[in-house]
Amino acid sequence: GLLSFDCYGKVVPAIAKSWEHNEDSTVWTFHLRDDVDWCDVNGEVKSHLTSKDFLVGFEWVLNAFKNEAFNTSMPSETVVGAADYYDLTKDKGDAAADMTYEDMLAAGVGVEAPDDYTLVFTCPNPCPYFDTVAAYNSFYPASEDLIKELGVEGFRACDYTTMWYNGPYLMEEFIQANTKSFIPNPNYYAANECTRFEHHTVKMISDLSIGLQLYESGEVDNIDLTESNLTTITSDSNNAHNAYLCEKRPTKYSFQMHLNFQRKDENGNLDENWNKAVANYAFRQCFYKGLNLVNYYARTNKINPLKCENDFYTMPGVCYNTKGEEYTTLVAKEMGLDGEAYDGKTMKRRRSNIGDISDLKKQAMEEPSAIGVTF
């Protein structure tokens, strides 16, 4: 795709070697490499990749007939005219199969290719995180030559033997519900910028509970462990597997707890008791400063549970300002948490009171009780 993510979750170049945006982050310009080729499963070069391929791919995603609505939500919300074009193709029915990227451009969708190696997207609103959006598969390129060769139905149903590649590997073999094997793409544009496996096989494990057995027998080199496997290993300091545990690559999502300020009962009437209680600041702070989520975090990251801690609506790394400052670090300053470094032991919000919320609890019961709340 245009961009990718490094092992720390930060956006890095891929087919786009550089990119920039205007002052209000509504116009994003991507400068593409000029050494990217499409090749088939045998490594034979089939076509040269240019900005046109991204237009073709984007039209495919937004075309209701061709793409059948897969992965349309993100571009529909972040690119001018994208949602309208999707609706247009939906109204066209089967006739949308003949529509091309030129129809998309004529319809006013906010994407253009000024030359073979420049791509410009226009957002309906400021979108400072658009580079992370552009790394998503909704923005992948597609070869017009391959679509013409296979036809719309054939392209939609293509497999590893008929698809074209531009990434670091070619798929050598795919056995349904068993394995898929990869070999280096001899035409990979960044071959001299990375290290690749000579041969790599991904084994599909239907039951993760047997994953550890496969690892111990040497059938696989790495696996995701079940929670019970992890508990068994980490609870025994002499277990040899402790030396080989490692954290997984961070992912771009977050979970939050949302409190309902207008709860209704089973009859549809406002639950005044709860609504008055939750409106009380001390009541809410009991949740914020009292809940110890370390054990819950450990279900995702047993090695460093507090690496999962997030005091913000968005996850770290989603967007940066024009000075290169990461968004959540700016929010941390506003919350007074910017001096609270990761310590691996205590949640940031619990450090000031060591989890003791007895005074807060007293306040959270006295104040609502004074206005008729019962506990």
List PLM regions with ranges:
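N-terminal lobe/hinge region of extracytoplasmic solute-binding protein
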Residues: 1-23, 164-165
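Short, glycine/acidic-rich hinge or "gate" loops at secondary-structure transitions
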Residues: 70-74, 300-314
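Gly/Pro-rich hinge or "lid" segments in bacterial periplasmic/extracellular proteins
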Residues: 93-98, 105-108, 115-117, 122-201
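Beta-strand-rich interaction surfaces with strong enrichment in secreted/lumenal proteins
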Residues: 19, 108-110
